[in-house]
């Protein structure tokens, strides 16, 4: 996307953010919104910094992710002020001077020391809603994170602007580039570590830049939902590959999962194909007015139907759901909101004034319980796994006869399957952000 088009989209995005901030400040009774970018700080008993992570509330306003000790100040009716920390430092690379599509929309002040920000922040700290972590405290400017302000801003973050959708699309393109390289490395017999390195090289991002730790799981490791160990030697024989990996674009995240079989003629490949087709249908059901909780329950029924067809279950999908057996094979939620954060905020919010929509009973890991509305971007990530500790619970709970254990043993060496796309809820049909990028890659 060209800079002029991002310039126009950013201008509209900024109008949306200022309108939201106006309302949030009014609800909280504050005169100014003050957002620190966050600071670097040392690891315990060491002189090395933890990897820096920018405050999500800061990067909502600015496409800046590597500017610690900086600040965003917004006062209703005025242009946003950016206090940009650019130190004199010959030990490290300092941030480049502000440039890009956003600079003409803000008043920018360069500081060389963190405490120089004090002269540029609003005079009365008590009139400021300061959104940040405790380490960002500067003099009297202590992050207070007022709940009415956070409730409103975080609830509204579910509704993506056109600018945000553009950056999410860029993040998709970067991640798919990595996924294609990772699949090629798998087909070439690389180790998990080698596949991970191929992914990072293709995306052009290291572990600190990626939005989350890559899940690169070969064979049985696919049964560990968040497997991040990265084995140095490829297993023999090589059976399967599950990759859950994303990319970052100006502070916005992608989150994509694919599963591959080494043998395209195997039963496991057929099971992948069935889950993939079901996942595509689930994504098409992302529509305004649909309760995401129901999509999650429907996903359980669809996946258990597949396991019944493949001879893994001996009972109906409905019986598997009612008895909790389905949770042994599909133990996580269908998905979550995504945007500035991989698991974006306010997935349980009852309204922009707070409150919580509870998860369905028996589904403790679902991360989104809201009714879908236009502008929301969600992940759709059904999975089927063969996890010993969960399957043991099925036996302990007296449901051993509901499972064909011979079929389970046949699939266990492959670990599991997960397919994940990002989908936009619109006024009409769902827009899958992920599939077209794979098709074009």
Swiss-Prot record:
InterPro entries: Creatin/AminoP/Spt16_N (IPR029149), Creatinase/aminopeptidase-like (IPR036005), PepQ_N (IPR048819), Pept_M24 (IPR000994), Peptidase_M24B_aminopep-P_CS (IPR001131), X-Pro_dipept-like (IPR052433), X_Pro_dipept (IPR022846). Binds 2 manganese ions per subunit. One of its GO terms (biological process) is proteolysis. Its EC number is 3.4.13.9. Mn(2+) 2 binds at residues 244, 255, 420. The keyword Hydrolase applies. It is an enzyme of class 3 (hydrolase). It catalyses: Xaa-L-Pro dipeptide + H2O = an L-alpha-amino acid + L-proline. One of its GO terms (cellular component) is cytosol. One of its GO terms (molecular function) is aminopeptidase activity. The keyword Protease applies. Mn(2+) 1 binds at residues 255, 336, 381, 420. Its cofactor is Mn(2+). Keywords: Dipeptidase, Hydrolase, Manganese, Metal-binding, Metalloprotease, Protease. Splits dipeptides with a prolyl residue in the C-terminal position. Belongs to the peptidase M24B family. Bacterial-type prolidase subfamily. This is Xaa-Pro dipeptidase. It comes from Xanthomonas oryzae pv. oryzae (strain KACC10331 / KXO85).
